[in-house]
Amino acid sequence: MSDIQNSLREQAREVLLCCHAEKKAQYALDVFTAHQKGELRTSLLENKGWPERPGRPETPELLSPKDMPKRRSGGPAGRIGLLHALAHIELNAIDLAFDLLGRFENTPMPEEFYTDWLRVGAEEAKHFMLLQGRLKSLGRHEGPLP
């Protein structure tokens, strides 16, 4: 593994930039596992800059809550809408956790900072995958709702 590949910051950057929701979640879990095994350094030899925004799938289009269509909360469609919203929240939580791992490159942080945020990111990834699995069992996925 090269110095860049085994850099926690670089791996966090790659999670953040990933545009495919399921791959992002799996990659977050893989980075957590690699860190647990001691395979990642918490410093970076090369600064590629930090993304302003996380990678996102082309769909669904991100809208302000005020621009979202009103959905009924009851019935199967309402439950699917709720699961979909929760999956989207978990995807954003993955990005928030992994953004924190690299954004403060010039501020020395204790190892526990990285360990804790990696754990948070991995937990959010697990939550996303559980919700995604449930949505798939209902014939849907995290993405645009009809």
Task: List each language-model region with its residue ranges.
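Non-heme di-metal
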Residues: M1-P146
